[in-house]
Amino acid sequence: MRYTTALLLGCILFFTGTAQRIYRSNSVLASGEWYKISVKEAGVYRVNISLLQSLGVNVSNLQSSSIRLYGNGGEMLPEQNAIIPLDDLTENAIQIVDGGDGVLSGSDYFLFYSNGPQQWIKDSTNKRFRHQKNLYSNEAFYFINIGGSGLRITNRTVGGA
Protein backbone atom coordinates (compact mmCIF):
# COMPACT_ATOMS: atom_id res chain seq x y z
CA MET A 1 0.00 0.00 0.00
CA ARG A 2 2.77 2.45 0.93
CA TYR A 3 4.60 1.70 -2.34
CA THR A 4 1.47 2.36 -4.42
CA THR A 5 0.81 5.63 -2.60
CA ALA A 6 4.42 6.76 -3.01
CA LEU A 7 4.38 5.83 -6.70
CA LEU A 8 1.12 7.68 -7.26
CA LEU A 9 2.43 10.75 -5.42
CA GLY A 10 5.66 10.63 -7.44
CA CYS A 11 3.73 10.47 -10.71
CA ILE A 12 1.53 13.39 -9.71
CA LEU A 13 4.54 15.52 -8.77
CA PHE A 14 6.40 14.56 -11.94
CA PHE A 15 3.56 15.36 -14.32
CA THR A 16 2.34 18.52 -12.60
CA GLY A 17 5.86 19.85 -12.09
CA THR A 18 6.65 20.00 -15.79
CA ALA A 19 6.02 23.07 -17.91
CA GLN A 20 2.56 23.20 -19.38
CA ARG A 21 2.37 22.94 -23.16
CA ILE A 22 1.04 25.99 -25.00
CA TYR A 23 -0.78 25.31 -28.26
CA ARG A 24 -1.65 27.68 -31.08
CA SER A 25 -5.24 28.84 -30.98
CA ASN A 26 -5.66 28.46 -34.77
CA SER A 27 -3.85 26.50 -37.44
CA VAL A 28 -2.25 28.36 -40.33
CA LEU A 29 -4.63 26.34 -42.51
CA ALA A 30 -7.64 28.02 -40.87
CA SER A 31 -7.68 30.91 -43.34
CA GLY A 32 -6.75 31.52 -46.96
CA GLU A 33 -6.65 29.21 -49.94
CA TRP A 34 -4.33 26.20 -49.70
CA TYR A 35 -2.92 23.89 -52.36
CA LYS A 36 -1.50 20.50 -51.38
CA ILE A 37 1.54 18.86 -52.99
CA SER A 38 3.49 15.73 -52.06
CA VAL A 39 7.04 14.43 -52.48
CA LYS A 40 8.34 10.87 -52.19
CA GLU A 41 12.00 11.34 -51.29
CA ALA A 42 14.54 13.84 -50.00
CA GLY A 43 15.71 16.46 -52.46
CA VAL A 44 15.26 19.87 -54.02
CA TYR A 45 11.90 20.24 -55.76
CA ARG A 46 10.78 22.60 -58.51
CA VAL A 47 7.25 24.02 -58.64
CA ASN A 48 6.48 25.68 -61.98
CA ILE A 49 3.50 27.54 -63.44
CA SER A 50 2.08 24.37 -64.97
CA LEU A 51 1.96 22.60 -61.60
CA LEU A 52 0.44 25.64 -59.90
CA GLN A 53 -2.28 25.82 -62.59
CA SER A 54 -3.06 22.11 -62.19
CA LEU A 55 -3.55 22.73 -58.46
CA GLY A 56 -6.07 25.49 -59.21
CA VAL A 57 -3.88 28.52 -58.47
CA ASN A 58 -4.85 31.67 -60.38
CA VAL A 59 -1.48 32.35 -62.03
CA SER A 60 -2.42 35.53 -63.92
CA ASN A 61 -0.22 38.33 -62.52
CA LEU A 62 0.95 36.08 -59.66
CA GLN A 63 3.30 38.12 -57.47
CA SER A 64 6.25 35.89 -56.61
CA SER A 65 6.70 37.60 -53.23
CA SER A 66 3.26 36.33 -52.14
CA ILE A 67 4.03 32.61 -52.53
CA ARG A 68 4.39 30.72 -49.26
CA LEU A 69 5.14 27.05 -48.55
CA TYR A 70 4.29 25.21 -45.33
CA GLY A 71 5.16 21.72 -44.14
CA ASN A 72 7.01 19.78 -41.47
CA GLY A 73 8.76 17.18 -43.59
CA GLY A 74 7.51 13.65 -43.72
CA GLU A 75 9.27 11.89 -40.86
CA MET A 76 7.32 9.86 -38.35
CA LEU A 77 6.35 11.48 -35.07
CA PRO A 78 8.74 10.64 -32.22
CA GLU A 79 7.90 7.62 -30.10
CA GLN A 80 9.10 9.22 -26.87
CA ASN A 81 6.46 11.24 -25.06
CA ALA A 82 9.11 13.65 -23.75
CA ILE A 83 9.79 14.89 -27.29
CA ILE A 84 7.13 17.45 -28.06
CA PRO A 85 6.09 17.50 -31.73
CA LEU A 86 5.13 20.69 -33.56
CA ASP A 87 1.44 21.51 -33.23
CA ASP A 88 1.12 23.29 -36.58
CA LEU A 89 2.76 23.57 -39.97
CA THR A 90 5.91 25.68 -40.22
CA GLU A 91 6.74 27.94 -43.12
CA ASN A 92 9.57 26.68 -45.33
CA ALA A 93 12.02 28.95 -47.14
CA ILE A 94 11.80 28.85 -50.94
CA GLN A 95 13.98 30.18 -53.76
CA ILE A 96 12.07 32.15 -56.41
CA VAL A 97 13.33 32.16 -60.02
CA ASP A 98 11.14 34.74 -61.79
CA GLY A 99 13.52 36.59 -64.11
CA GLY A 100 13.68 39.50 -61.67
CA ASP A 101 10.31 41.03 -62.60
CA GLY A 102 8.53 39.99 -59.38
CA VAL A 103 5.84 38.06 -61.29
CA LEU A 104 5.73 34.29 -61.65
CA SER A 105 4.91 33.58 -65.30
CA GLY A 106 6.05 31.63 -68.34
CA SER A 107 9.00 29.41 -67.44
CA ASP A 108 9.38 30.83 -63.89
CA TYR A 109 9.37 28.53 -60.87
CA PHE A 110 10.29 28.19 -57.22
CA LEU A 111 12.50 25.66 -55.47
CA PHE A 112 12.32 24.09 -52.02
CA TYR A 113 14.08 21.32 -50.13
CA SER A 114 12.26 18.41 -48.50
CA ASN A 115 13.60 15.72 -46.17
CA GLY A 116 11.02 13.36 -47.63
CA PRO A 117 9.22 10.66 -45.66
CA GLN A 118 12.41 8.97 -44.43
CA GLN A 119 15.19 10.18 -42.18
CA TRP A 120 18.69 9.40 -40.99
CA ILE A 121 19.03 9.45 -37.21
CA LYS A 122 22.38 9.96 -35.49
CA ASP A 123 23.18 7.26 -32.91
CA SER A 124 25.89 8.89 -30.77
CA THR A 125 26.28 5.84 -28.54
CA ASN A 126 27.17 3.47 -31.38
CA LYS A 127 28.80 6.22 -33.51
CA ARG A 128 26.71 5.58 -36.58
CA PHE A 129 23.57 6.68 -38.37
CA ARG A 130 20.46 4.59 -38.75
CA HIS A 131 17.86 4.87 -41.47
CA GLN A 132 14.22 5.24 -40.44
CA LYS A 133 11.45 4.73 -42.98
CA ASN A 134 8.08 6.33 -42.30
CA LEU A 135 5.84 3.33 -41.64
CA TYR A 136 2.64 5.30 -42.16
CA SER A 137 3.23 7.21 -45.40
CA ASN A 138 5.41 7.04 -48.50
CA GLU A 139 4.97 10.77 -49.08
CA ALA A 140 5.69 14.07 -47.35
CA PHE A 141 3.05 16.74 -47.82
CA TYR A 142 3.44 20.48 -48.26
CA PHE A 143 0.90 23.26 -48.59
CA ILE A 144 1.19 26.30 -50.87
CA ASN A 145 -0.52 29.54 -49.90
CA ILE A 146 -0.74 32.77 -51.88
CA GLY A 147 -0.76 35.94 -49.77
CA GLY A 148 1.51 37.92 -47.48
CA SER A 149 5.29 37.87 -47.72
CA GLY A 150 6.81 34.43 -47.96
CA LEU A 151 9.98 33.12 -46.33
CA ARG A 152 12.93 33.01 -48.74
CA ILE A 153 16.22 31.13 -48.91
CA THR A 154 19.03 33.55 -48.13
CA ASN A 155 22.54 33.50 -49.54
CA ARG A 156 25.45 33.01 -47.15
CA THR A 157 29.14 33.41 -47.77
CA VAL A 158 31.33 30.36 -47.37
CA GLY A 159 34.60 30.75 -45.49
CA GLY A 160 37.85 29.22 -46.69
CA ALA A 161 39.43 26.25 -44.96
Residue spans for each PLM region:
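Bacterial Sec-dependent N-terminal signal peptides
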Residues: 1-22
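Structured catalytic cores of large enzymes
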Residues: 20-39, 55-161
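Short amphipathic, basic-aromatic surface patches that mediate peripheral association
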Residues: 43-58
